[in-house]
């Protein structure tokens, strides 16, 4: 199985399966001299880890990360300094229940990658989905913690903006609320609505989809490239690689189909500091594949978790028609824990383009 890496100069390779002994990543291309602590990386993993509320999977994993290579310790004994060699990180799996999946060893779960993995490779790891499990994304979050340190002044934040048909009120958007509720919601008024709604979904053994919005501030103007190296092209590709993601939009995205040219234009003026300013950001901070210096804005849609208790029609690997009810511990809304994953993927993409621009033009330090 190939295609386990993404990025060009800031290149991330992930490894490991849902029910294996461990998983992790190798970050290749991190510049020397990047300073970070284990606690800083762990904080992002803690945001993603399972079992933190009744609205996510009850699998209990501490997701404690170990840095195995590519760094030296500073004199304070805590700060790690990248050496420029590959940074390898590992996270042990400690709460696997492979027996929960014995009944689907030959049965294909509708909506999962069971059938497609089997038809391509002739073998699949049915224990929690193996490599196709969202468990793999813990490694991406660890890599994202490094990426945030590569670009000076970069701030990447994300929030859940929709569950099912229930959307936030954007007039209530408050970043300080995101970490005060189990949904990473920026609108405190939507929290009780989502709680009641998801409780019903969860008790019925069903699942529901969601939309995550991720925003990067401090993105240097000029990074990216035209045609086949566009910044938004890579953002879309990398966000689409997240498990269960079925759609990505940049800026106003599909809503631009309803706008006139006058409405959609991001007009410009000269600011009081003599630098260009934009009067709007319909483009989501990217024009012609190149960053404008405005916030980079993306959203991605996540399908309902395919593992549900409702019996569904399917087939098995012997060609028999069967009914499948999925056991195990699963997220009723996988979009909740996708928030820090989206942050990590955007951070890695921007770090990669930052280094590519620095290598090509030499204008960024």
Swiss-Prot record:
Homotetramer. FMN binds at residues 131-133, 243-244, 288, 303-307, 329. NCBIfam families: aroC (TIGR00033), PRK05382.1 (NF003793). InterPro entries: Chorismate_synth (IPR000453), Chorismate_synth_AroC_sf (IPR035904), Chorismate_synthase_CS (IPR020541). NADP(+) binds at residues 48, 54. One of its GO terms (molecular function) is chorismate synthase activity. It catalyses: 5-O-(1-carboxyvinyl)-3-phosphoshikimate = chorismate + phosphate. This reaction introduces a second double bond into the aromatic ring system. This is Chorismate synthase. It comes from the Bacteria. Disulfide bonds: none annotated. Keywords: Amino-acid biosynthesis, Aromatic amino acid biosynthesis, FAD, Flavoprotein, FMN, Lyase, NADP. SUPFAM superfamilies: Chorismate synthase, AroC (SSF103263). Belongs to the chorismate synthase family.
């Amino acid at each position: 199985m190939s295609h386990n890496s993404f990025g060009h100069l800031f290149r991330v390779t992930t490894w490991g399966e849902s029910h294996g002994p461990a998983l992790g990543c190798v970050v290749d291309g991190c510049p020397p001299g990047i300073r970070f602590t284990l606690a800083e990386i762990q904080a992002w993993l803690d945001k993603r880890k399972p079992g933190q509320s009744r609205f996510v999977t009850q699998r209990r994993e501490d997701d404690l990360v170990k840095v195995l290579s590519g760094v030296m310790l500073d004199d304070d004994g805590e700060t790690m300094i990248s050496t420029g060699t590959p940074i390898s990180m590992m996270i042990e799996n400690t709460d696997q229940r492979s027996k929960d999946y014995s009944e689907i060893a030959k049965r294909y779960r509708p909506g999962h990658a069971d059938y497609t993995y089997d038809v391509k490779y002739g073998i699949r790891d049915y224990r929690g989905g193996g490599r196709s499990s969202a468990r793999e994304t813990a490694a991406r979050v660890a890599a994202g913690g490094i990426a945030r340190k590569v670009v000076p002044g970069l701030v990447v934040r994300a929030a859940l903006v929709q569950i099912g048909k229930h959307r936030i009120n954007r007039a209530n958007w408050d970043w300080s609320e995101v970490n005060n509720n189990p949904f990473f919601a920026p609108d405190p008024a939507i929290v009780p609505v989502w709680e009641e709604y998801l409780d019903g979904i969860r008790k019925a053994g069903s699942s529901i989809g969601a939309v995550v919005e991720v925003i990067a501030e401090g993105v240097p103007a000029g990074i990216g490239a035209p045609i086949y190296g566009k910044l938004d092209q890579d953002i879309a590709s990398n966000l689409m690689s997240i498990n269960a993601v079925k759609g990505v939009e940049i800026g106003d995205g599909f809503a631009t189909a309803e706008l006139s040219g006058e409405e959609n234009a991001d007009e410009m003026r000269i600011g009081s500091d003599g630098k260009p300013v934009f009067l709007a950001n319909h483009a989501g901070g990217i024009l012609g594949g190149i960053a404008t210096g405005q916030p980079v804005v993306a959203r991605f849609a996540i399908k309902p978790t395919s593992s549900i208790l409702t019996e569904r029609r399917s087939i098995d690997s012997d060609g028999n028609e069967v009914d499948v009810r999925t056991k195990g511990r699963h997220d009723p809304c996988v979009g909740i824990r996708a928030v820090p994953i989206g942050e990590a993927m955007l951070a890695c993409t921007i770090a990669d383009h930052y280094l590519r621009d620095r290598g090509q033009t030499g204008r960024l330090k």
